[in-house]
Amino acid sequence: MLYDTFMRKMDRILAGLMARGQGLLLTVQSVGGGTEYIHTDDLMSVEVFGHKLVYHTKGGDREGYGTIAAQAAELEKLSFLQPSRSAIVNPRFIEAVKGDTVRVGGVEIPISRLRKKEFLSELNRWICK
């Protein structure tokens, strides 16, 4: 089976799986080469370090390439929040907000001063839903 044929079939299968669940499958260009898929129901947060994105999931961390802005635009419709320009968090996994940090899955993520008011407001809106 050719790679292109395989990828087309895999995309159809994944699209069918996506339609069944509430979440979304993110396509990640992995650091080791190739493509990985992460379901947003398992995604706790995304952080940018240099030119790499680190996806913190229930199953462990994964690294990939891309921009945080592109991921934020895709995840915004699923109520993910952005405490700073370098991170996106899934509010379902927020354990604590203390001072200028938010703890998600045991990872402390800084909340920028410029976004703190908006972040806390969005988090409050999400909690009250």
Model regions and ranges:
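C-terminal output/interaction extensions
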Residues: 119-129
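DNA major-groove recognition helices of helix-turn-helix
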Residues: 71, 118-119
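Conserved binding/recognition cores within well-folded domains
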Residues: 4-104, 108
